[in-house]
């Protein structure tokens, strides 16, 4: 049995993860939660801070906000247990901190836990270099009106994957305004926030005579929870410090 402490247990994703762990993952048990809201109805104890947790566990799973990062890393270092980061909105300084921390603990990070998005991300590694010469590349990401970070972590993941796959130097733009002709080396990430959109990501390869679109639409938060719980199963026995991702969980390398 994989014993998990869930940071952000009282939020929307925390609720979905708790339910799926109970109904579809018989080998995973949420043994405790961490959240500012300690009054949520959960079948496990909820603590306000990581350092308050006194429960034995195998994996610490974070699905909250970027500002929880340092306290979670310190707790994982103290307990010598793997940490899974599923939050987004990290700053450049945060990412550097994550990189350094992975030298001390087994640290998993993914901007999107969906199996589909990770397949799309790997597909882009092959597609972008083939199409770049004759196609302009644009991205559109759409999310609900409560999402606080923009562009989404997933959009940045896809954009950086495209950049890294190309021999040519490109530059990222975030939205467009004013009067200016599009430059060939631009990759623009456009953001939409509205309603209850769970998460849509669209990569557009626009040529003179044809347009290729690669789309992913999340129609249920279950897809993120399933990926997170699979990551918990994968990371439970990891003792070696290092960086891990959904590519490791899904064994993607094509």
From Swiss-Prot:
Segments crossing the lipid bilayer: none
Positions that bind NAD(+): 8-13, 35, 86-88, 110-113
Keywords of the record: Amino-acid biosynthesis, Cytoplasm, Diaminopimelate biosynthesis, Lysine biosynthesis, NAD, NADP, Oxidoreductase
GO terms, biological process: diaminopimelate biosynthetic process; lysine biosynthetic process via diaminopimelate
Keyword Cell cycle: no
InterPro entries, alphabetized: DapB_C, DapB_N, DapB_N_CS, DHDPR_bac, NAD(P)-bd_dom_sf
Pathway note: Amino-acid biosynthesis; L-lysine biosynthesis via DAP pathway; (S)-tetrahydrodipicolinate from L-aspartate: step 4/4
Positions bound to (S)-2,3,4,5-tetrahydrodipicolinate: 144, 153-154
GO cellular component, one term: cytosol
Catalytic activity, as annotated: (S)-2,3,4,5-tetrahydrodipicolinate + NAD(+) + H2O = (2S,4S)-4-hydroxy-2,3,4,5-tetrahydrodipicolinate + NADH + H(+); (S)-2,3,4,5-tetrahydrodipicolinate + NADP(+) + H2O = (2S,4S)-4-hydroxy-2,3,4,5-tetrahydrodipicolinate + NADPH + H(+)
Active site: 143, 147
EC number: 1.17.1.8
Keyword match Kinase: no
NCBIfam families: dapB
Summary of the function given for this chain in its UniProt record: Catalyzes the conversion of 4-hydroxy-tetrahydrodipicolinate (HTPA) to tetrahydrodipicolinate.
Protein family per UniProt: Belongs to the DapB family.
Name of the molecule in the record: 4-hydroxy-tetrahydrodipicolinate reductase
Organism field: Clostridium perfringens (strain ATCC 13124 / DSM 756 / JCM 1290 / NCIMB 6125 / NCTC 8237 / Type A)
Source species taxonomy: Bacteria, Bacillati, Bacillota, Clostridia, Eubacteriales
Name of the gene encoding the protein in the UniProt record: dapB
